[in-house]
């Protein structure tokens, strides 16, 4: 990605998906790379890959209406605490909110607040990947949690959601970098954890990590995106595989723009626009590819009990107020 900055405008990589992103009130993304010029890579524990983005890449985020990012993932400390601090400094300068990592455990667990024209959104972020990145009382790192039935993280979610509501948040998002790569279906304990998060006050669970999209679900009026897959990702070309870890049948180049329509802060419709992430630039899927992406999502989500309808732009799920009482 950084190589493009000297040859292409920041808008180029988003292709014909850019108007969709700009048409939203705000875009939330998982930022799985530090933004830094620091060259000291993480050596405390073994890592195969160390990611880093040129500071000029912030322009790519800003032009796509990305207003808030999750930093809770297994790459944000690839260039140590210096890289994390640089990232936070660049995001702050660009006016992009962030959650999920910080100078200590309190900062890493702190929510991001996003003020839109009509409402306030609170964003929580956490990860169960790369335990060696875990923050401490005076240790920079991520908001590392255990995804389990009786995880202490559920208390943090309930407490944080209640505090955000008191501070005026109408919508609460929990962004989770969780689970293994290339898995098409969430494990049972992940589903139980997502349900528990909704029951503790979260409106939208935003999952990511697998590099392929997974099912979507509506639970008690809340939206669960178990994994949103890849979007802008140049890791696939590391060994010229043409696909991450050479699993082309997984189609890590298939994805969606996930749009949640809100009413008084509550989800009322989930819209999914099929996208192909390779070759660059990003583009809305058409023809056979669009149909294949849509069918996979329908198949993956069928077991979760909510019918997905075809819409002009892709797929959609309607969410009624009555769903909140189920």
Each language-model region and where it sits:
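Acidic, metal/ion-coordinating pockets
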Residues: 1-326
């Amino acid at each position: 990605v950084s190589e493009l900055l000297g040859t292409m405008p920041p808008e180029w990589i988003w292709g014909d998906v850019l108007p969709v992103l700009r048409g939203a009130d705000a875009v939330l993304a998982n930022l799985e790379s530090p933004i830094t010029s620091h060259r000291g890579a993480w050596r405390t524990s073994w890592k195969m890959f160390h990611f880093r983005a040129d500071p000029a890449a912030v322009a790519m985020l800003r032009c796509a209406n990305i207003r808030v990012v999750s930093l809770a993932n297994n790459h944000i400390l690839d260039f140590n605490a210096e890289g994390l601090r640089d990232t936070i400094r660049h995001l702050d300068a660009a006016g992009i909110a962030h959650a999920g990592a910080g100078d200590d455990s309190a900062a890493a667990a702190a929510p991001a607040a996003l003020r839109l024209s009509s409402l306030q959104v609170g964003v929580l972020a956490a990860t169960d990947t790369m335990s060696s990145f875990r923050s401490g009382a005076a240790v920079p790192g991520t908001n590392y949690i255990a995804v389990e039935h009786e995880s202490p993280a559920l208390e943090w979610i309930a407490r944080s959601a209640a505090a955000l509501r008191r501070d005026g948040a109408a919508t609460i998002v929990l962004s989770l970098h969780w689970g293994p790569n290339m898995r098409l279906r969430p494990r049972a304990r992940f589903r139980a954890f997502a349900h528990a998060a909704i029951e503790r006050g979260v409106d939208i669970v935003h999952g990511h990590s697998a590099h392929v999209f997974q099912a979507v679900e509506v639970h008690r009026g809340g939206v669960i995106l178990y994994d949103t897959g890849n979007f802008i990702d140049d890791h696939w070309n590391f060994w010229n595989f043409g696909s991450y870890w050479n699993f082309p049948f997984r189609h890590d180049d298939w994805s969606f723009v996930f749009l949640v329509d809100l009413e008084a802060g509550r989800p009322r419709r989930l819209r999914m626009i099929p996208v192909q992430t390779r070759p660059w630039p990003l583009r809305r899927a058409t023809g056979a590819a669009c149909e294949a992406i849509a069918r996979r999502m329908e198949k993956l989500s069928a077991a979760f009990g909510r019918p997905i309808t075809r819409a002009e732009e892709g797929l959609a799920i309607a969410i009624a107020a009555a769903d909140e009482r189920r």
